[in-house]
Curated annotation (Swiss-Prot):
GO CC, one annotated term: phenylalanine-tRNA ligase complex
UniProt-recorded name of the protein: Phenylalanine--tRNA ligase beta subunit
BP GO annotations: phenylalanyl-tRNA aminoacylation
TM regions (residue ranges): none
Signal sequence bounds: none
Keyword Transmembrane: no
Ranges of residues in domain B5: 271-347
Top-tier EC class: ligase
């Protein structure tokens, strides 16, 4: 989980409260504090679901409300600016989503610079899936000339000096020689053109999601910033809102950027709050309190929501634009509970006494995990939600019946998986920068014909991966689990014909294994042979 370093003097100045009070109240907001009596700072750990608390500015803002110093909705004005960002059609197939902002009038201190850099990297991890979904660029705007352009170009066409280097390089050279290029080049695998942000004089600001240009490096005397956030998911806009509002907490003046794409124009950022309605009956039932509508509204104002009671049972809630975690009324109610204080909940003895024991399926899962670790495999946890392209098309499998998400918030998560193997292939594709061999396994739920089942899946990738290896693995698993299944040739498109097998038990297919088809390997951007298996455990 992200660890935020908070310097006492800096935090006291931003919050307007004493060090002792801050340390006392922080844990009640859900923070885990690690401190040294002799240090001039504390390290605070928050759950990953609150990316707005990944910075000293965000923590100070939340504390001001929690302590009653500045309750209610923070107001951030987006002033009219003169900067334009022109989004070229060429980026649509590479990294199509971008949001921008200008923040002026900043005065950097060492704690401020450290906080901004930490926030940027933590958002890359927490919201950005290590820059795949979101990458953030922060630039000294005084060194470039708008309007800016967001384009995709041949990686050998243009040269510029990347951050922390003193020589000009092409994008391809950066991916081969720059430490950041080596670390993130896998994100651009398979693309013929790479994204760039350039100014009116063709100076390069950024090569997202890899590296900024040295030209726009933020220095101690920098006062005006240009922020770009690019990615493949609308969470880009949430990340932008978190960054610009954190800068505004340091006294920055936010200016909008006119975004011009081939099909629309808009002003970025959009900091308008979302509007929700919460009922006291639902809140009191959920958390065991007995709050009136006005008391509930007051609790929410201390959590930096805008809140007013509409009637005896309803509260209108304005959710600030930097709160990327609010997806349900229960998220708002949880904040009300924190504000009221869990310590104010009265303890009640349970009316019944029961003695728990592990579910047989959980015991089987633990047995399987121990077995796979003993066989030299590393456990991973692919997402249960996936999409048709990864699950069927890239696996060379026909799209069968599956459970679909009714209102997906991302095109990456539209169905519930019916198999675990595609998720393992996806994880292999994300880990090509690690050494081979890689042997991974996962134990998890799938949904088939409306029923939840548990599957084991495993993959192995290296230059010598072959049928004998995966066949030996399956034999060991079957022997240890005392399963007697018939092995027959498989017609599964995920495997090479003649090198794939199905496991049959009482006439039903309970698993499969074999050498992954080269087309599947290529679809996931892999370059070495892969073998895989899948077995139903809920027999």
């Amino acid at each position: 989980m992200p660890v935020v370093r908070l310097y006492y003097e800096d935090l006291e100045e931003m919050v307007g409260a004493s060090r002792e009070l801050i340390i006392e109240r922080l844990p009640m907001m859900g923070a885990d504090i690690g401190k040294s009596p002799e240090a001039d700072y504390i390290d605070v750990e928050f759950f990953p679901d609150r990316p707005d608390l990944y910075s000293a500015e965000g923590v100070a803002r939340a504390l001001q409300g929690f302590l009653g110093i500045r309750p209610g909705l923070p107001e951030y004005q987006v002033h009219t600016g003169s900067v334009e960002m022109r989004v070229d059609e060429s980026v649509k197939s590479v990294r199509p989503i971008i949001g921008c902002a200008v923040v002026r009038g900043l005065r950097f201190t060492d704690p401020f610079i450290e906080s901004l850099m930490s926030l940027q990297e933590d958002l890359h991890w927490g919201l950005g899936r290590n820059r795949r979904k979101v990458a953030i660029g922060v630039h000294d705007i005084s060194r470039v000339r708008p309007p800016f352009r967001y384009i995709a170009e041949d990686p050998d066409k243009r040269r510029f000096v990347p951050l922390d280097f003193d020589e000009s390089m092409s994008m391809r050279e950066i991916l081969e020689r720059h430490p950041k290029g080596v670390a993130y080049r896998h994100i651009l695998d398979g693309f013929e053109r790479f994204p760039l942000i350039v100014d009116a004089d063709d100076n390069v600001l950024s090569f997202p999601p890899v590296i900024n240009g040295e030209l726009t490096r933020v220095r101690e005397d920098t006062t005006d910033l240009f922020i770009d956030v690019t990615g493949t998911d609308p969470v880009v806009y949430r990340a932008l809102n978190i960054v610009v509002t954190a800068l505004a907490e340091r006294g920055g003046r936010i200016e909008g950027v006119r975004m011009i794409s081939p099909d629309k124009e808009w002003i970025s950022p959009d900091l308008s709050p979302a509007r929700w309605t919460v009922t006291t009956s639902e809140a009191n039932s959920l958390i065991g309190f007995n709050l009136s509508a006005e008391e509930l509204a007051e609790c929410l104002r201390r959590m930096r929501f805008g809140a007013r009671h509409l009637d005896n049972d309803s509260v209108e809630v304005l959710v600030p634009a930097y709160r990327a975690d609010i997806m349900h009324t229960w998220d708002i109610i949880e904040d009300a509970a924190k504000s009221y204080g869990y310590e104010n909940l009265k303890a009640e003895m349970p009316r019944t006494l029961t003695i728990g024991r592990p579910h047989p399926m959980e015991e089987l899962k633990d047995e399987v995990r121990d077995l796979m670790v003993g066989l030299g495999y590393l456990e991973v946890m692919p997402f249960t939600l996936t999409n048709e392209k990864v699950h069927f098309e890239m696996m060379r499998r026909s799209a069968g019946e599956c459970t679909r998400v009714m209102h997906p918030i991302s095109e990456l998560h539209t169905i519930i998986r019916t198999a675990v193997l595609p998720g393992l292939m996806e994880i292999l594709s994300l880990n090509q920068h690690h050494a081979l061999p890689q042997r991974l396994f996962a134990v998890g739920d799938v949904v088939i014909d409306g029923r939840t089942k548990c599957h084991l899946s495993a993959v192995s990738i290296h230059s010598g991966a072959g049928f004998a290896e995966i066949s030996s693995l399956v034999s060991a698993i079957m022997r240890e689990l005392r399963i007697s299944a018939e092995v027959v040739e498989s017609s599964d498109g995920a495997f090479i014909p003649g090198r794939g097998a199905d496991l049959m038990l009482n006439g039903a297919r309970i698993g499969c294994f074999g050498e992954i088809h080269p087309e599947v390997i290529s679809a996931f951007g892999l370059e070495h042979p892969v073998v895989g298996m899948e077995l139903e455990l809920s027999l």
